[in-house]
From Swiss-Prot:
Binds two Mg(2+) per subunit. The magnesium ions form salt bridges with both the protein and the DNA. Can also accept other divalent metal cations, such as Mn(2+) or Ca(2+). It catalyses: ATP-dependent breakage, passage and rejoining of double-stranded DNA. One of its GO terms (cellular component) is chromosome. HAMAP family: ParE_type2. Topoisomerase IV is essential for chromosome segregation. It relaxes supercoiled DNA. Performs the decatenation events required during the replication of a circular DNA molecule. This is DNA topoisomerase 4 subunit B. The gene is parE. Its cofactor is Mg(2+); Mn(2+); Ca(2+).
Amino acid sequence: MKSNYSATNIKILKGLDAVKKRPGMYIGSTDSKGLHHMLWEILANSVDEVLAGYATNITVTLDLNNTITVSDDGRGIPYEIHQDSNISTIDTVFTFLHAGGKFDDQSYKLAGGLHGVGASVVNALSDHLEVTVKRNGQIYQSVYQAGGKIIQKAKKIGDTTSHGTTVSFHADPKVFKKAQFDSNIIKSRLKELSFLFAKLKLTFTDQKTNKTTVFFSTSGLVQFLDEINNTVETLGQKTLIKGEKDGIEVEVVFQFNQSDQETILSFANSIKTFEGGSHENGFCLAISDVINSYCRKYNLLKEKDKNFQLSEIRQGLNAIIKVNLPEKNIAFEGQTKSKLFSKEVKNVVYELVQQHYFQFLERNNNDAKLIIDKLLNARKIKEQIKQQRELKKSLSSPQKEKILFGKLAPCQTKKTSEKELFIVEGDSAGGTAKMGRDRIFQAILPLRGKVLNVEKINNKKEAITNEEILTLIFCIGTGILTNFNIKDLKYGKIIIMTDADNDGAHIQILLLTFFYRYMQPLIELGHVYLALPPLYKLETKDRKTVKYLWSDLELESVKLKLNNFTLQRYKGLGEMNADQLWDTTMNPTTRKLVQVKLDDLINAEKQINIFMGEKSDLRKHWIEANINFSVEN
């Protein structure tokens, strides 16, 4: 059947309709990440007032119904009738795409909200939004509903001696479904901003918990790096480099450490560039060139030795890169601004870092020796891993099958996106899972031996020769560390399914530590999940009602509604029969899965070091600060 294609098929989306039709083009997604991006857009406008030198306080409030409010003490959005829209400037900013104060080269010399769509996009994707502006001794207010429809045009509602802008919005549940603001994600971002702008006061109030947190830093990026380095053993001193060229301001602080994990955070005009870009490229290239030049000058690399690759140098490097660029120079890839694409900044960052870091190493020979000795040792380990990879390649199919024999129960489908790998604790639960699964798309891998704590080993060779770890590597297929290739992934979902007890939780942490250290992109790309088996089975005496419960809170709620029932507490997966395990934990339509996310890299690194590392004093401190040992009768 052919369809007609004519002029009537061409649609012109007016006003904010384009945003409502394709929200992902403007905020990246309509899940939790997209919801928080809405907040970042409004927050960026307040931060632009800080960049311009007019604001010193920002407050964020999350109320009980998921409405969020951002307030600053900047200049306030102008109220006057706009010459092009013929409505107030406040309403223009919130109802017209590409309307803002960042285009005239005068109001903001530096700004992060450059596309002029942030405020209007948030309005388009909210079912309610209010703007209150304090400016020139007067208070103005606008109210919008249903995706930007003006309910109350901007009007004067009072007088004031203060100044600033307050925006409150409630995201449209039709767009964001069940997504909720996460106070931990918000606090993490505000904490970053306090480090980026020393002496800026940021206050967050979560009305759900009735807690207020204040973020304030006196030493900026140096304090930020100290926070990142809190749980690692550092090598030498911190290096702080500041400079300016052609109107581009650069501030970089970095330090090497004994681990092999890198944390490189970059910001452009206060916008966090998750995917890096030209400023990161300039920094990394400069560090690489300086270290290799230093090694050649002092014969620390033999003539036959190859230069250190950037991937080698970045291991154990923690760095924060902050650049401020004039509006004419700055360009981001995409509306979500996750990657900086300004060509000029790469050269400026490179020149400043290259010049100052070489001088730093010349003045601090002991620091240079510590760093380069570590790089040489890491190169030896890399060679060992390469040999192990060659061993893997050399294994014939029968040999690989021998390693997996009696362990992996494969599935039938060949489509990676549909395949699920359940990593199960022990043969007992593994046997039940094999019987209860859907063989078409679900594979089962029981773990028989103890999972290695990779955080406590000194040599990576110990990890890649451990039988359980080697089995995981073969099953998943991507390789590890620098040899990781997501294209070789064999399963769309990797699901850790353990007992709902302390031992099960410990196995989860051991496996997550391995994935985080050796296969981090699996987590970053959303392939790792935790299965949630129920804690209780409740059945009425007449056997007409059977309920599975996942928490004590659910249990107490059900007890109020039902009488005459029997209750079974599951101590392990093996206590369920195959049908029960399928219904509660494996069936995609009824199960509960938790996707493991890496929203806060710094906090993840810190938690891994605390719980799985060698420093018992860190664990003791965490327990004392977070666990209440009081007993209630």
